[in-house]
A protein has these predicted regions:
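Glycine-/small-residue-enriched transmembrane alpha-helix faces in small-molecule transporters
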Residues: 1-37, 41, 80, 84, ...
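Hydrophobic alpha-helical transmembrane segments of multi-pass integral membrane proteins
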Residues: 5-10, 36-52, 127-130, 150-157, ...
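Hydrophobic alpha-helical transmembrane segments of multi-pass membrane transport proteins
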Residues: 13-20, 24, 53, 72-91, ...
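Membrane-interface helix-cap regions at the ends of transmembrane helices
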Residues: 24, 46-64, 132-146, 189-214, ...
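Helix-loop interface residues and adjacent transmembrane-helix termini in multi-pass membrane transporters
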Residues: 31-32, 91, 117-119, 175-176, ...
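Specific alpha-helical transmembrane segments that line the substrate/conduction pathway
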Residues: 37-48, 78, 86-119, 124, ...
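C-terminal-most transmembrane helix of multi-pass membrane proteins
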Residues: 39, 43, 140-141, 214, ...
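Hydrophobic transmembrane alpha-helices of multi-pass small-molecule transport proteins
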Residues: 50, 72, 111, 120-140, ...
Length: 317
């Protein structure tokens, strides 16, 4: 297998595995776990795996004092993005939620335009309008589909939080930190938030030995949409660069919709199909359009990736 083919395959695997989030999260809800318990264990299992990966790559664990506050801010943004995304699954079909979440590159482009005075092309403006039309269709998706205003607001909150996370990382000194190290500390901050919430509320759902199948879902939620997605993303960027990898991120919502329909009996109406196509095409055009694609170096919802700005190759693994 040549390098380019390998890169495209890995990018597709990365996006598809991230799209498995609902596949493993929804059974945990059905088994009695609340979203904070799900995220508590997901973060808790991911942190040591990242630490091992960091050690294998012979990276140090030290941080400077000036990095502490940015890491706390990023940890809060990341935790908020996770909370709102996983909350949305309680109020709408997971496939629709994952598709609306996919608009975060457009939100990043708007943030860069409004706050950093970066030019926004007519093509990007047209894509934004098309994406909004797609979202309107998804929110009025027809008989049988589960969509609520509360769910849509949660997804928008998740997309906005993650967009702010991306911009903060790329516009601050913290962006120079090794990717895995940064992610590990960000998740550590998030885990502290979830642990504090559990202590204050006195509520943390821990599956019993009889509920072994829930532990399998927790581990799968950690391994597939997180660790495998991270590894495949870093390798894909090395092989084909950041923009093609970002474009293949289109498989994230497609995978979520596929499992939603196949496993959870979510409804697929003509409006949903048209809405999906409009959102996916508009976002793909924005990502392929230059600087926004370069800015979205940290692609995965769980584990972003850093790329050398000059070469387009993965850096500081």
């Amino acid at each position: 297998m040549n390098t380019k083919v390998k890169g495209y395959v890995l990018a597709a695997i990365s996006a598809a595995t991230y799209g498995m989030n609902p596949l493993f999260a929804l059974p945990l809800y059905e088994g009695g776990m609340d979203l904070y318990s799900v995220l508590f264990f997901r973060y808790m299992f991911a942190i040591p795996i990242l630490a091992v990966m960091l050690k294998i790559r012979r990276r140090d664990f030290s941080i400077q004092r000036a990095d502490v506050m940015p890491l706390i801010i990023l940890g809060v943004l990341f935790a908020l993005s996770s909370i709102t995304l996983f909350s949305s699954y309680n109020y709408m079909d997971a496939g629709i939620a994952s598709t609306i979440l996919f608009i975060y590159p457009i939100i990043v482009a708007l943030i860069m335009f409004i706050f950093f005075k970066e030019k926004i092309s007519k093509k990007t403006m047209a894509c934004i309008a098309v994406a909004l039309l797609g979202i309107v269709l998804l929110c009025n998706s027809g008989e049988g589909a589960v969509v609520s205003t509360k769910g849509v607001l949660f997804v928008f909150g998740s997309a906005l939080s993650y967009s702010l996370y991306i911009v903060f990382v790329n516009k601050s000194r913290i962006g120079k930190m090794a990717t895995i190290k940064l992610t590990m500390y960000v998740l550590a901050v998030g885990w502290i938030i979830f642990a504090a919430k559990a202590l204050i509320s006195g509520q943390l759902y821990t599956p019993s030995p009889e509920q072994w199948y829930l532990w399998i879902n927790v581990l799968a939620l950690t391994i597939f949409p997180t660790i495998i997605s991270l590894i495949c993303t870093t390798e894909a960027i090395q092989c084909i660069g950041s923009t093609p990898t970002a474009i293949l991120g289109v498989l994230e919502p497609v995978t979520a919709v596929f499992f939603g329909v196949l496993v959870f009996d979510e409804v697929m109406t003509p409006r949903i199909v048209v809405g999906l196509i409009l959102v996916i095409v508009s976002v793909t055009l924005v990502v392929a359009g230059g600087h926004t694609g370069k800015l979205l170096l940290r692609l995965r919802k769980m584990f972003p990736v850093k790329v050398n700005k000059r070469t387009g190759q993965q850096d500081n693994k």
